[in-house]
Regions:
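Alpha/beta enzyme core
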Residues: 11-12, 63-93, 101-189
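Pocket-edge positions in alpha/beta enzyme catalytic cores
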Residues: 54, 95-96, 171, 238-239, ...
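Alpha/beta catalytic cores of nucleotide-metabolism and tRNA/nucleoside-modifying enzymes
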Residues: 2, 8, 106-109, 113-116, ...
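Active-site beta-loop-alpha junctions enriched in small/polar residues
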Residues: 1-3, 27-29, 55-57, 82-84, ...
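Short secondary-structure transition/capping segments
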Residues: 33-37, 89-92, 132-133, 163-166, ...
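Glycine-rich, positively charged N-terminal anion/phosphate-binding segment
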Residues: 4-75
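Short, hinge-like loop/turn segments at secondary-structure boundaries
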Residues: 39-43, 95-97, 137-139, 168-171, ...
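Hydrophobic faces of well-ordered beta-strands that scaffold small-molecule active sites
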Residues: 22-24, 50-54, 77, 119-123, ...
Length: 318
């Protein structure tokens, strides 16, 4: 998610789940080719498995960007065909590509020629006045013919005009049954569902109905304690750290970030929702929001915020 799933966010999320695939922010192919590669592509070994999400519509550019990214060691390269923002549309990529499946096929074929890891596609079920019942299977069939075997389908249409990106995540109705149908019609493909999933319980239910995976975005960001802690149970792993453990596991990373010239709020802005719905959550957010942006702020701010949580928990227990 753009402006959200940066390296700091991914490191934080990895403290809660060892198995879930983490995705970068979308990076455009021209940015990878011409921009500051280390800043855009660097990630830590602790983040694996991690996927790079690319935006673009020029097969040559996407191939070059994939070739560059290959040397960084990502576990997956994902082409975004689902983002509806005006900025993305003006570059002729994102959700607008749902109207051009043959071009998407050309793009992924070029990317696969430069990749030694899976190339995947994230898409919508359709855009504007398209009929998803007809458009989505045709899109999957066309792109799969170019060698892609893994699709993440956001189970909503995108309206390219008249709705903001936020509205496009909320107003178009969800159609989970259509995505489930696609798995039945294309059993050879890996089909993952995105959109409207806010809990591990929902994820388990969808997986039990035959889907290969579930992508959870904003719910995992805003309420990571409920969505990510325990997620490894989906793989049969008994790994569910306590929230306080997660915070303490972040402290060495934060100290290293600060020692390298970084600012505290660059990391802690992703941690605000960790205690969502629990006693002390408000105090946690208040301390981090008020103090992490100050010059010279260090891990003592995080310790102070955590004390607000533990203090409230002890007060209620007493």
């Amino acid at each position: 998610m753009m402006d959200w799933t940066d390296r700091h966010c991914r490191v934080f999320h990895r403290r809660m789940t060892r198995r879930a695939m983490l995705y970068t922010e979308m990076v455009t192919a021209p940015a990878v080719i011409h921009g500051p590669k280390a800043r855009l592509l660097d990630f830590g070994a602790e983040e694996h498995p991690v996927a790079l999400q690319l935006g673009g519509s020029d097969p040559g550019e996407l191939a070059r960007a994939t070739g560059i990214a290959r040397d960084w060691g990502y576990d997956e390269i994902n082409l975004n065909c689902g983002c509806p923002s005006d900025r993305v549309q003006s570059g002729c990529f994102g959700a607008v590509l749902m109207e051009r499946p043959a071009l998407v096929a050309d793009c992924v074929a070029a990317m696969r020629g430069e990749s030694d890891v899976p190339v995947t596609v994230k898409c919508r079920i359709g855009v504007d006045e398209q009929d998803p019942q007809e458009v989505l299977p045709r899109f999957l069939e066309t792109v799969a013919a170019a060698g892609v075997r893994h699709f993440i389908v956001h189970a909503r249409k995108a309206w390219l005009q008249g709705l903001s990106p936020k509205e496009n995540r909320e107003i178009p109705p969800l159609d989970h049954p259509l995505v489930l149908r696609m798995k039945r019609e294309f059993p050879e493909l890996t089909i993952c569902l995105n959109g409207g999933v806010t809990s591990l319980e929902q994820a388990r239910d969808l997986l039990a109905q035959g889907l290969d995976g579930v992508m959870i975005g904003r719910a995992a960001y805003h309420d990571p304690g409920h969505v990510l802690i325990g997620a490894d149970g989906l793989w049969g792993m008994d790994h569910a750290p306590a929230r306080e453990e997660v915070v303490r596991a972040m402290l060495p990373y934060i100290e290293a970030h600060l020692a390298g010239g970084g600012r505290l709020h660059q990391v802690t802005r992703h941690m605000l929702g960790l205690f969502h719905g629990l006693p002390g959550a408000r105090g946690w957010r208040q301390v981090l929001s008020a103090e992490a942006g100050r010059g010279g702020a260090g891990v003592e701010v995080v310790e102070r915020a955590l004390a607000r949580v533990t203090g409230e928990t002890e007060r209620l227990a007493g």
